[in-house]
A protein has these predicted regions:
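Short, hydrophobic/amphipathic alpha-helical patches that form generic packing surfaces
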Residues: 1-3, 18-22, 54-58, 154-160, ...
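Basic, alpha-helical nucleic-acid-binding regions used in initiation and control of genome expression
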Residues: 2-42
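Short, conserved secondary-structure transition motifs
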Residues: 6-7, 161, 296
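Intrinsically disordered or highly flexible coil/loop and linker segments, enriched in small
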Residues: 11, 29-33, 65, 108-115, ...
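Intein modules and their embedded homing endonuclease domains
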Residues: 41-208, 212-214
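P-loop NTPase catalytic core of nucleic-acid-dependent motor ATPases
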Residues: 67-90, 137, 171-173, 178, ...
């Protein structure tokens, strides 16, 4: 896979190696898990001595496409959750894998060691038995350490170096034509809805699922009726719907600011609330001083 990737010619696709890993995990989860396990197993022998760096390399080999350290000083971590990259406190989810996932891997290794010890004992091979006995004690010590807070702290410090991407935060949310829903990503340039990809570099998503609607669906008719009550003038109603559609494109390419004016009870607050519920974190309320105050 790595060799083929290296000799491939560049086309219009912007897929990264991380995305190919993600595609593989979606296409065949069990085979992908087996592949990643074999990748990380390369570092298991070195890790038996208890090196924090070797443990970190095991985690990198198995989870390098899912976690990023964006700042070593501030310990800022992100995890790809299927649609977006979500920030997590101190890399806590990766840290949990040390006590759970890696501990289980070394438990399985110790079971194999016990089998080899038994075989060498039955064969009355003292040299082999001593070798496996030493190995067993090393793994037993490591298993205890994997559940120790000070040991995990040191491993996470090494993970910061292994998973570090100094430009990661600069890449986030830079494509104005991608918008994340709860169940996928809509590409406004290609006019397609698809699964999220790591190289989308999205960190925010709307509060709603994407679904296809027909004009005669009950929900569509209800929204149209609501808008027609607020905007009886059909041309004004169409103008607002076109305007509202622009909110899905990042930035302000028209360089316009809109003010909703009018007396009370004319639907402004309800309309605003609907937009906020739909957009989630993408809807921001800022202080009026941003407009009325002096330039910074």
């Amino acid at each position: 896979c790595i060799y083929e990737w290296g000799i491939m010619k560049k086309h219009v696709y912007t897929y990264t190696l991380g995305t190919l890993y993600y595609f593989a995990s979606q296409d065949s989860p069990e085979l992908y898990k087996e592949y990643k396990s074999k990748q990380s197993s390369k570092f298991m022998e070195e890790a038996i001595d208890g090196s924090h760096n070797d443990i970190a390399k095991m985690l990198k080999a198995e989870h390098g496409c899912d976690f990023i350290c964006a700042s070593i000083e501030s310990k800022i971590w992100f995890q790809f959750t299927g649609q977006t990259w979500e920030q997590m406190e101190g890399g806590v989810i990766l840290r949990q894998k040390i006590s759970n996932e890696l501990s289980q891997r070394f438990t399985e290794m110790q079971c194999n060691i016990f089998k080899n010890m038994l075989d060498s004992e039955n064969a009355q091979n003292e040299g082999e038995k001593a070798k496996w006995d030493k190995r067993s004690k090393q793994v037993q010590t490591l298993r205890r350490n994997l559940k120790s807070a000070p040991f995990k702290n040191n491993v996470m410090r090494e993970c910061q170096d292994e998973f570090f991407d100094p430009r990661f935060k600069e890449k986030l949310d830079t494509n104005p034509y991608l918008i994340a829903f709860q169940n996928g990503v809509y590409d406004l340039e290609k006019n397609v809805f698809r699964k999220g990809r790591p190289e989308d570099f999205l960190s925010k998503k709307m509060n709603v699922n994407y679904r296809e609607y027909d004009d005669d669906d009950e929900e569509v008719i209800e929204v149209h009726n609501f808008l027609e009550k607020i905007f009886p003038d059909k041309s004004l109603c169409k103008y607002f719907m076109d305007l509202a559609s622009d909110v899905f494109v990042g930035g302000n390419y028209q360089k316009k600011v809109y003010f909703w004016l009018g007396s009370g009870d004319n639907g402004k607050s309800i309309l605003q609330k609907l937009m906020e519920l739909m957009l989630g974190k993408l809807a921001i309320k800022f202080d009026t001083s941003l407009i009325t105050g002096k330039k910074p």
